């Protein structure tokens, strides 16, 4: 089989860098500027369906592998919020800091002491409009009282994974990759490529 790259269906630079690290030695291709306009709005009601929307849309015009994900944070005592709206929790175009501020404010204003939560990552691999692989992985933990750490992105500074006393943003990359939702999903994808002897290298 001809070796080929995997197009990552995201315009998020942080996600591209993290997935590139997690999927090594598979080779990811960043989404070109002229294709970013083809990314559909995340209008589905589940992570997996949102990932499928993005993967199938790009597969319409890209002949190789397309990898799409949708991720989010769910706080159990907030009935799963922010959930599929994690990236825009504080409104359309909101920053990661604004989303964090809103979440911490909600927990504080409602005097919530049960801060259990989980990260979710739905991953879908598409080629020629056919779904070849899909999985959903989780990382359980709690929401910290305040932000800590300068690593990672998104809600990492306020999420403490099970078995740790540090936030995701305080963990080094190796530690984070072992426990994170994306790390677990990517391990499954790499196993799929290996089991099916498929090529995703440059």
UniProtKB/Swiss-Prot annotation:
Q: Name one GO cellular component term.
A: cytosol
Specify one Pfam family: Ham1p_like
Cofactor(s) recorded for this entry are: Mg(2+)
What EC designation does it have? 3.6.1.66
- Give the reactions, separated by semicolons, that this protein catalyses: XTP + H2O = XMP + diphosphate + H(+); dITP + H2O = dIMP + diphosphate + H(+); ITP + H2O = IMP + diphosphate + H(+)
Q: Does the keyword Magnesium apply?
A: yes
Active-site residue numbers: 70 (proton acceptor)
Q: Which GO terms describe its molecular function?
A: dITP diphosphatase activity; ITP diphosphatase activity; metal ion binding; nucleotide binding; ribonucleoside triphosphate phosphatase activity; XTP diphosphatase activity
Binding positions (substrate)? 10-15, 71, 153-156, 176, 181-182
Annotated keywords: Hydrolase, Magnesium, Metal-binding, Nucleotide metabolism, Nucleotide-binding
Has UniProt tagged this entry with the keyword Chaperone?
no
Q: How is the cofactor bound?
A: Binds 1 Mg(2+) ion per subunit.
UniProt record, GO biological process:
nucleotide metabolic process; purine nucleoside triphosphate catabolic process
- Residues binding Mg(2+) are 70
- Coiled coil region boundaries: none
Q: Top enzyme class of this protein?
A: hydrolase
Q: Which Gene3D superfamilies match?
A: 3.90.950.10
Q: Which family does it belong to?
A: Belongs to the HAM1 NTPase family.
Can you state the subunit structure given in the record?
A: Homodimer.
Described purpose of this protein according to its UniProt entry: Pyrophosphatase that catalyzes the hydrolysis of nucleoside triphosphates to their monophosphate derivatives, with a high preference for the non-canonical purine nucleotides XTP (xanthosine triphosphate), dITP (deoxyinosine triphosphate) and ITP. Seems to function as a house-cleaning enzyme that removes non-canonical purine nucleotides from the nucleotide pool, thus preventing their incorporation into DNA/RNA and avoiding chromosomal lesions.
Question: What name goes with this protein?
Answer: dITP/XTP pyrophosphatase
What are the leading ranks of the lineage?
Answer: Bacteria, Pseudomonadati, Verrucomicrobiota, Methylacidiphilae, Methylacidiphilales
